[in-house]
């Protein structure tokens, strides 16, 4: 069965490899692709990040976005880039959306506000940025948890497909479920914390349906093989597993 990892932070350089432990410091783009394909993953998506402190202004984010495009050139059909925007830089973010749209890039994120010095999804600048994303029917993957209501953003931009990253603990899972029940344009990716809890995937499928759950790992922070086995280990019907591992991402990304 094909596996699409919706949530990876790819890299060519050490500064962009978000590994936790020094034993993984020698990984490069080739090693990254080998690890992922050995886990059964045939396609990845996501934004490039850096271990370095972010400099003031939008230039640092723009460089990460260009690195994502360079990785697409080297990785070919293996990788769908995601790109960064920032509500403190409305004009630059809108220009970046236009730039990426012209190149066929439809995925914003994963957006990681705590790394980039912002924490709002409801300000005027953010809404203006998302208005343009709505015009282009883009996808927006964002880091969770957040301690504010995402409802206004979701309601105001029905043409944007929002993807919340990380199921989280039991309380957070229930918050995801309630928000997803109110907003049909909200999906959840399985990366990061949460999937190791036995039964969480089956619970999500029961509550919101398999069609709105995307496989993701958060590699290289997390071990991709563990996530593949966590999905397979739920012993869900084959057609449900197929939707989660690849079908939903393929549909949303128009692969």
Predicted regions and their residues:
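Mid-to-C-terminal alpha-helical segments outside catalytic/metal-binding sites
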Residues: 1-10, 15-43, 210-212, 225-255
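Mobile, glycine- and charge-enriched loop segments
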Residues: 1-22, 62-84, 184-187
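Conserved, mostly hydrophobic/aromatic
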Residues: 7, 36, 68, 100, ...
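A cross-domain feature marking catalytic cores of carbohydrate-active enzymes
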Residues: 8-10, 48, 83-87, 109-112, ...
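Divalent metal-dependent hydrolysis catalytic cores, especially in the metallo-beta-lactamase
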Residues: 9, 30-56, 79-84, 106-110
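Acidic-and-aromatic substrate-binding clefts and catalytic sites of carbohydrate-active enzymes
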Residues: 20-27, 52-62, 86-93, 116-122, ...
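Active-site gating/metal-coordination segments in enzymes
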Residues: 58-139
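Catalytic pocket-lining loop regions of alpha/beta-barrel enzymes
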Residues: 106, 120-214
């Amino acid at each position: 069965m094909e596996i699409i990892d919706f949530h990876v932070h790819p890299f060519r350089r050490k500064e962009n490899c978000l590994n936790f432990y020094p034993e993984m410091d020698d990984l490069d783009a080739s090693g990254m692709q080998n690890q992922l394909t050995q886990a059964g993953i045939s396609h990845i998506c996501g934004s490039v990040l850096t271990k370095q402190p972010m400099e003031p202004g939008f230039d640092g984010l723009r460089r990460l976005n260009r690195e994502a495009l360079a990785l697409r050139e080297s990785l070919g059909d293996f990788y769908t880039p995601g790109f960064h925007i920032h509500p403190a830089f409305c004009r630059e973010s809108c220009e970046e959306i236009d730039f990426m749209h012209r190149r066929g890039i439809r995925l914003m994120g994963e957006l990681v506000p705590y790394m980039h010095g912002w924490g709002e999804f409801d300000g005027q600048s953010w809404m203006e940025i998302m208005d343009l994303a709505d015009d282009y029917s883009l996808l927006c993957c964002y880091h969770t948890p957040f301690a504010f209501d995402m409802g206004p953003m979701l309601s105001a931009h029905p043409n944007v497909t929002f993807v919340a990253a990380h199921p989280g603990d039991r309380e957070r899972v229930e918050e995801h479920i309630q928000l997803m029940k109110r907003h049909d344009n909200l999906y959840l990716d399985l990366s990061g914390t949460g999937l190791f809890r036995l039964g969480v995937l089956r619970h999500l499928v029961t509550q919101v349906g398999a069609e709105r759950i995307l496989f993701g790992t958060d590699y290289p922070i997390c071990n991709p093989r563990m996530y593949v086995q966590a999905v397979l280990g739920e012993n869900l019907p084959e057609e449900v597993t197929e939707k989660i591992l690849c079908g939903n991402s393929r549909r949303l990304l128009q692969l």
